[in-house]
Every structure is written in C-alpha cells, then in structure tokens.
C-alpha cells in the first residue's frame, strides 16, 4: 500500500468525524471521492506548494496534516486528522508541532485554518495550540454551506 493509499484510507475514516451530524452521508462520500482519494493524495504529495505530514504507529499512518503555501507569507493548515483511537494520545500535539515547524521553515508569518463552528473539540485543540478566531467563512459540502471559523496563529 502506498502512502497515498494509506492517506486516503485514513481520510475516509476521519473526515466524516469532523462533519456536523446533519450532513448527509452521500455528500460526505462525494467530497471524500473528489478530494481525498488515493489519486488526489498522489497529486498532493508531488505538489511543491503542499506538505503532507504524518503521524505513524508501527509504521502505519494513523493521522495526517496538509499545509498549503499561499502567495503571501501565510500558510493554510488545510487538514489535520487522526484516527479516533489516537485521540488523546499526544499524537495531535506532535503533529501540530511538525505543522508549525514546517510553516516556520517555509518562512511563514502565520498559519491559518478553517474549522466548523459546531466542531468544539477541534476548536479547543486549536485554541490550546495558540490559534485564535479571526473571522468566518463558508465551506460547501454537498448541497449545504457549512459555517467555519477562521483561526490564525502568528509565528513571529
């Protein structure tokens, strides 16, 4: 199994956990197929504007984060997901440490992310790691428009 295959398998299990309960399973599946497939991860892994960082256990990918360089000195933390069995183990904090170090190595001034306004667990984690709410945005998922908070962490 390639890293792209493993990442797609983890994404298929973890992305639905971050979605509000009202989102229809077919909309989640459609998003996963379009954006989190093995083929898409193969593209992401070769894209010089992206970095995919992994959390591993016994050599297997159990979580990942994806960073995207902007045209300015901002970096988007596009995704950060862990398999449920690894929540509360310190794996997310270790992955976030890699995220911030990579962004700093790229010369970023700040890292930003979007998190669903109903995902309080993720919001608490991001706040604990220094992110602050800086605005809102909408995220289309199927026929629905979900409301996200934009959270930012300054690096300098």
Swiss-Prot record:
Q: What is this protein called?
A: Uncharacterized N-acetyltransferase Mb2688
**In the record, which residues are listed under signal peptide?**
none
Membrane-spanning parts:
none
Which GO molecular-function terms appear in the entry? acyltransferase activity, transferring groups other than amino-acyl groups
Look up and give the organism this protein is from. Answer: Mycobacterium bovis (strain ATCC BAA-935 / AF2122/97)
Q: Which InterPro entries match?
A: Acyl_CoA_acyltransferase, Bact_Acetyltransf, GNAT_dom
Q: Look up the domain of life of the source.
A: Bacteria
Upper lineage: Bacteria, Bacillati, Actinomycetota, Actinomycetes, Mycobacteriales
Give the PROSITE patterns listed for this entry: GNAT (PS51186)
Limits of the N-acetyltransferase domain: 10-156
Keyword terms: Acyltransferase, Transferase
**Which of the seven top EC classes does this enzyme belong to?**
transferase
Family of the protein in this entry: Belongs to the acetyltransferase family.
The EC designation for this entry is 2.3.1.-
Q: Which Pfam families match?
A: Acetyltransf_1 (PF00583)
């Amino acid at each position: 199994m390639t890293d792209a295959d493993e990442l797609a398998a983890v994404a298929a299990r973890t992305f639905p956990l971050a979605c509000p309960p009202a989102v229809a399973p077919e909309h989640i599946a459609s998003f996963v197929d379009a954006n989190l497939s093995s083929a898409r991860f193969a593209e992401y892994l070769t894209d010089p504007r992206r970095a995919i960082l992994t959390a591993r256990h016994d050599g297997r990918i159990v979580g990942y984060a994806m960073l995207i360089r902007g045209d300015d000195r901002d970096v988007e933390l596009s995704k950060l997901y862990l398999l449920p069995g690894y929540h509360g183990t310190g794996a997310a904090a270790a992955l976030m440490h890699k995220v911030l170090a990579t962004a700093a190595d790229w010369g970023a001034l700040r890292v930003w992310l979007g998190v669903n306004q109903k995902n309080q667990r993720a919001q608490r984690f991001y706040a604990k790691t220094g992110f602050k709410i800086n605005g809102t945005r909408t995220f289309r998922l199927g026929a629905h428009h979900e409301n996200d908070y934009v959270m930012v962490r300054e690096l300098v």
